[in-house]
Protein backbone atom coordinates (compact mmCIF):
# COMPACT_ATOMS: atom_id res chain seq x y z
CA UNK A 1 0.00 0.00 0.00
CA UNK A 2 2.87 2.36 0.78
CA UNK A 3 4.43 1.56 -2.58
CA UNK A 4 1.18 2.41 -4.37
CA UNK A 5 1.32 5.90 -2.89
CA UNK A 6 4.93 6.43 -3.94
CA UNK A 7 6.51 5.92 -0.50
CA UNK A 8 8.18 2.93 1.11
CA UNK A 9 7.95 1.91 4.77
CA UNK A 10 11.22 3.61 5.72
CA UNK A 11 10.10 6.93 4.22
CA UNK A 12 6.75 6.70 5.98
CA UNK A 13 8.44 6.16 9.35
CA UNK A 14 10.94 8.96 8.73
CA UNK A 15 8.11 11.37 7.95
CA UNK A 16 6.19 10.39 11.08
CA UNK A 17 3.11 9.78 8.98
CA UNK A 18 -0.23 9.31 10.72
CA UNK A 19 -1.47 5.87 9.54
CA UNK A 20 -5.12 6.95 9.35
CA UNK A 21 -4.32 10.13 7.47
CA UNK A 22 -2.02 8.22 5.14
CA UNK A 23 -4.69 5.59 4.49
CA UNK A 24 -7.23 8.31 3.70
CA UNK A 25 -5.22 9.09 0.56
CA UNK A 26 -5.37 5.46 -0.55
CA UNK A 27 -9.05 4.78 0.18
CA UNK A 28 -10.21 7.85 -1.74
CA UNK A 29 -11.25 9.98 1.23
CA UNK A 30 -8.55 12.62 0.93
CA UNK A 31 -9.01 13.07 -2.85
CA UNK A 32 -12.73 13.55 -2.18
CA UNK A 33 -12.01 16.14 0.54
CA UNK A 34 -9.58 18.08 -1.65
CA UNK A 35 -11.93 17.93 -4.64
CA UNK A 36 -14.69 19.29 -2.43
CA UNK A 37 -12.47 22.21 -1.40
CA UNK A 38 -11.71 22.97 -5.06
CA UNK A 39 -15.38 22.67 -6.01
CA UNK A 40 -16.62 24.98 -3.27
CA UNK A 41 -13.88 27.54 -3.98
CA UNK A 42 -14.29 27.64 -7.77
CA UNK A 43 -17.83 26.61 -8.69
CA UNK A 44 -16.66 23.50 -10.53
CA UNK A 45 -19.04 20.66 -9.67
CA UNK A 46 -18.84 16.89 -9.06
CA UNK A 47 -20.31 14.20 -11.25
CA UNK A 48 -23.56 12.77 -9.79
CA UNK A 49 -21.74 9.62 -8.63
CA UNK A 50 -18.60 11.37 -7.38
CA UNK A 51 -15.01 10.72 -8.42
CA UNK A 52 -14.33 8.08 -11.08
CA UNK A 53 -10.50 8.20 -10.86
CA UNK A 54 -9.89 7.55 -14.59
CA UNK A 55 -6.33 6.27 -15.24
CA UNK A 56 -4.42 9.00 -17.03
CA UNK A 57 -0.89 10.16 -17.84
CA UNK A 58 0.03 13.83 -18.08
CA UNK A 59 0.00 13.68 -21.89
CA UNK A 60 -3.49 12.17 -21.91
CA UNK A 61 -5.16 14.71 -19.62
CA UNK A 62 -6.70 16.76 -22.49
CA UNK A 63 -8.05 13.55 -24.03
CA UNK A 64 -9.48 11.95 -20.90
CA UNK A 65 -10.62 14.99 -18.92
CA UNK A 66 -13.26 16.23 -21.37
CA UNK A 67 -16.96 15.33 -21.55
CA UNK A 68 -18.06 11.85 -22.62
CA UNK A 69 -20.06 13.51 -25.40
CA UNK A 70 -16.77 14.76 -26.87
CA UNK A 71 -14.77 11.56 -26.49
CA UNK A 72 -13.53 11.97 -22.91
CA UNK A 73 -14.58 10.48 -19.58
CA UNK A 74 -16.16 13.41 -17.72
CA UNK A 75 -19.88 13.59 -16.97
CA UNK A 76 -20.00 17.30 -17.82
CA UNK A 77 -17.90 20.39 -18.47
CA UNK A 78 -16.75 22.28 -15.40
CA UNK A 79 -16.30 19.08 -13.37
CA UNK A 80 -13.84 18.20 -10.61
CA UNK A 81 -12.04 14.88 -11.10
CA UNK A 82 -8.90 13.03 -9.97
CA UNK A 83 -6.52 11.18 -12.31
CA UNK A 84 -5.39 7.72 -11.17
CA UNK A 85 -1.69 6.87 -11.48
CA UNK A 86 -2.54 3.16 -11.86
CA UNK A 87 -4.39 1.24 -14.54
CA UNK A 88 -7.42 -0.80 -13.46
CA UNK A 89 -5.23 -3.93 -13.34
CA UNK A 90 -2.67 -2.24 -11.08
CA UNK A 91 -0.05 -1.43 -13.72
CA UNK A 92 1.77 1.85 -13.15
CA UNK A 93 1.11 4.62 -15.66
CA UNK A 94 4.29 6.22 -17.07
CA UNK A 95 4.62 9.99 -16.57
CA UNK A 96 1.71 10.12 -14.15
CA UNK A 97 0.69 13.09 -12.02
CA UNK A 98 0.21 11.38 -8.65
CA UNK A 99 1.96 14.14 -6.69
CA UNK A 100 0.90 17.05 -8.85
CA UNK A 101 -1.97 19.32 -9.77
CA UNK A 102 -3.55 20.12 -13.13
CA UNK A 103 -6.37 21.90 -14.89
CA UNK A 104 -7.81 21.11 -18.31
CA UNK A 105 -9.28 24.10 -20.13
CA UNK A 106 -11.16 24.68 -23.38
CA UNK A 107 -10.62 27.36 -26.01
CA UNK A 108 -13.74 29.50 -26.24
CA UNK A 109 -12.76 31.17 -29.52
CA UNK A 110 -11.02 30.19 -32.74
CA UNK A 111 -8.23 32.62 -31.86
CA UNK A 112 -7.55 30.80 -28.57
CA UNK A 113 -7.59 27.45 -30.37
CA UNK A 114 -5.04 28.78 -32.85
CA UNK A 115 -2.87 30.01 -29.97
CA UNK A 116 -2.81 26.50 -28.50
CA UNK A 117 -1.42 25.26 -31.82
CA UNK A 118 1.04 28.10 -32.31
CA UNK A 119 2.44 27.78 -28.79
CA UNK A 120 2.64 23.99 -29.24
CA UNK A 121 0.40 23.10 -26.30
CA UNK A 122 -0.62 19.51 -25.74
CA UNK A 123 -4.24 19.25 -26.93
CA UNK A 124 -6.97 16.74 -27.70
CA UNK A 125 -7.65 15.88 -31.39
CA UNK A 126 -10.03 18.83 -31.74
CA UNK A 127 -7.30 21.25 -30.67
CA UNK A 128 -9.74 22.91 -28.26
CA UNK A 129 -8.79 21.23 -24.96
CA UNK A 130 -5.39 21.69 -23.36
CA UNK A 131 -3.83 21.32 -19.92
CA UNK A 132 -1.60 23.20 -17.49
CA UNK A 133 0.00 21.22 -14.70
CA UNK A 134 2.67 20.94 -12.01
CA UNK A 135 3.94 17.39 -11.55
CA UNK A 136 4.93 18.13 -7.96
CA UNK A 137 2.75 19.85 -5.39
CA UNK A 138 5.18 20.92 -2.64
CA UNK A 139 2.63 20.85 0.15
CA UNK A 140 4.84 21.41 3.18
CA UNK A 141 6.77 24.20 1.49
CA UNK A 142 3.77 25.95 -0.06
CA UNK A 143 1.62 26.17 3.06
CA UNK A 144 3.93 28.78 4.59
CA UNK A 145 3.33 31.03 1.60
CA UNK A 146 -0.42 30.72 2.08
CA UNK A 147 -0.12 31.60 5.77
CA UNK A 148 2.06 34.61 4.99
CA UNK A 149 -0.30 35.72 2.24
CA UNK A 150 -3.24 35.72 4.65
CA UNK A 151 -1.31 37.38 7.47
CA UNK A 152 0.48 40.07 5.47
CA UNK A 153 -1.82 40.76 2.53
CA UNK A 154 -5.18 39.52 3.86
CA UNK A 155 -5.30 37.39 0.71
CA UNK A 156 -6.51 33.78 0.94
CA UNK A 157 -5.17 31.07 -1.34
CA UNK A 158 -8.76 29.98 -1.75
CA UNK A 159 -12.06 30.25 0.09
CA UNK A 160 -15.59 28.94 -0.49
CA UNK A 161 -17.88 30.82 -2.83
CA UNK A 162 -20.73 28.35 -2.44
CA UNK A 163 -21.80 24.92 -1.18
CA UNK A 164 -21.40 22.80 -4.31
CA UNK A 165 -19.81 19.58 -3.05
CA UNK A 166 -19.72 17.39 0.04
CA UNK A 167 -17.86 14.33 1.38
CA UNK A 168 -20.14 11.58 2.68
CA UNK A 169 -19.30 8.61 4.93
CA UNK A 170 -19.59 5.37 2.94
CA UNK A 171 -19.24 1.84 4.32
CA UNK A 172 -15.98 0.00 3.57
CA UNK A 173 -17.57 -3.31 4.55
CA UNK A 174 -20.86 -4.64 5.86
CA UNK A 175 -21.50 -2.87 9.17
CA UNK A 176 -23.66 -4.04 12.07
CA UNK A 177 -25.78 -2.05 14.54
CA UNK A 178 -23.75 -1.13 17.61
CA UNK A 179 -20.46 -0.74 15.78
CA UNK A 180 -18.54 2.49 16.30
CA UNK A 181 -17.50 4.40 13.20
CA UNK A 182 -13.82 5.35 13.20
CA UNK A 183 -13.81 8.17 10.66
CA UNK A 184 -11.40 9.22 7.93
CA UNK A 185 -8.78 6.62 7.05
CA UNK A 186 -10.19 4.02 9.46
CA UNK A 187 -11.61 0.52 9.11
CA UNK A 188 -15.33 1.30 8.79
CA UNK A 189 -15.94 4.15 6.34
CA UNK A 190 -14.36 6.15 3.55
CA UNK A 191 -15.32 9.51 2.08
CA UNK A 192 -17.22 9.75 -1.20
CA UNK A 193 -17.65 12.98 -3.16
CA UNK A 194 -21.31 14.02 -3.54
CA UNK A 195 -22.96 17.06 -5.12
CA UNK A 196 -24.26 19.04 -2.13
CA UNK A 197 -27.81 18.99 -3.47
CA UNK A 198 -27.72 15.19 -3.38
CA UNK A 199 -26.07 14.89 0.04
CA UNK A 200 -28.31 17.36 1.84
CA UNK A 201 -31.42 16.07 0.10
CA UNK A 202 -30.70 12.54 1.35
CA UNK A 203 -29.69 13.66 4.84
CA UNK A 204 -26.26 12.11 4.25
CA UNK A 205 -23.72 11.79 7.06
CA UNK A 206 -20.60 13.92 6.44
CA UNK A 207 -17.31 12.05 6.79
CA UNK A 208 -16.12 14.67 9.28
CA UNK A 209 -18.88 13.65 11.72
CA UNK A 210 -18.39 9.89 11.26
CA UNK A 211 -15.86 9.45 14.07
CA UNK A 212 -16.69 7.77 17.37
CA UNK A 213 -20.42 7.57 16.64
CA UNK A 214 -22.55 4.43 17.11
CA UNK A 215 -24.30 2.76 14.21
CA UNK A 216 -28.03 2.13 14.69
CA UNK A 217 -28.81 0.15 11.52
CA UNK A 218 -27.16 -2.53 9.36
CA UNK A 219 -25.28 -1.00 6.43
CA UNK A 220 -24.05 -2.82 3.32
CA UNK A 221 -20.54 -2.31 1.93
CA UNK A 222 -20.55 0.62 -0.49
CA UNK A 223 -23.70 2.15 1.02
CA UNK A 224 -23.51 5.81 1.98
CA UNK A 225 -24.70 6.61 5.50
CA UNK A 226 -27.30 9.11 6.66
CA UNK A 227 -27.84 10.91 9.96
CA UNK A 228 -30.69 8.46 10.63
CA UNK A 229 -28.23 5.54 10.58
CA UNK A 230 -26.22 6.73 13.58
CA UNK A 231 -26.60 7.95 17.15
CA UNK A 232 -25.48 11.55 16.80
CA UNK A 233 -24.88 13.93 19.70
CA UNK A 234 -26.62 17.09 18.45
CA UNK A 235 -25.06 19.13 21.27
CA UNK A 236 -21.56 18.90 19.79
CA UNK A 237 -20.23 22.16 18.35
CA UNK A 238 -19.18 20.45 15.10
CA UNK A 239 -22.68 19.03 14.62
CA UNK A 240 -24.31 22.40 15.34
CA UNK A 241 -22.04 24.14 12.83
CA UNK A 242 -22.77 21.54 10.19
CA UNK A 243 -26.53 21.82 10.74
CA UNK A 244 -26.27 25.61 10.50
CA UNK A 245 -24.28 25.34 7.28
CA UNK A 246 -26.94 23.07 5.78
CA UNK A 247 -29.71 25.49 6.74
CA UNK A 248 -27.90 28.50 5.32
CA UNK A 249 -26.22 27.16 2.21
CA UNK A 250 -27.86 23.92 1.05
CA UNK A 251 -29.39 24.21 -2.44
CA UNK A 252 -33.09 25.09 -2.32
CA UNK A 253 -34.16 21.86 -4.06
CA UNK A 254 -32.31 19.81 -1.44
CA UNK A 255 -33.99 21.68 1.42
CA UNK A 256 -37.41 20.87 -0.04
CA UNK A 257 -36.50 17.19 -0.53
CA UNK A 258 -35.23 16.91 3.04
CA UNK A 259 -38.46 18.22 4.58
What are these regions (language model features)?
Residues 10-257:
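C-terminal catalytic/substrate-binding lobe primarily of soluble NAD(P)-dependent oxidoreductases
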Amino acid sequence: MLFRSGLNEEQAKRGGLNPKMFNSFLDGSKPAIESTAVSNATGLTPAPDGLAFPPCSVEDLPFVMRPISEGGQLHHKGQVEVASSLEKDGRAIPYEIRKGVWVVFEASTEYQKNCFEEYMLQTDPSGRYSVMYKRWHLIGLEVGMSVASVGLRKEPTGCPIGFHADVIATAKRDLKPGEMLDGEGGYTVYGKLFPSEKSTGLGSLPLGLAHNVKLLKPIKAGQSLTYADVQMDESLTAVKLRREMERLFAPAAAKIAAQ
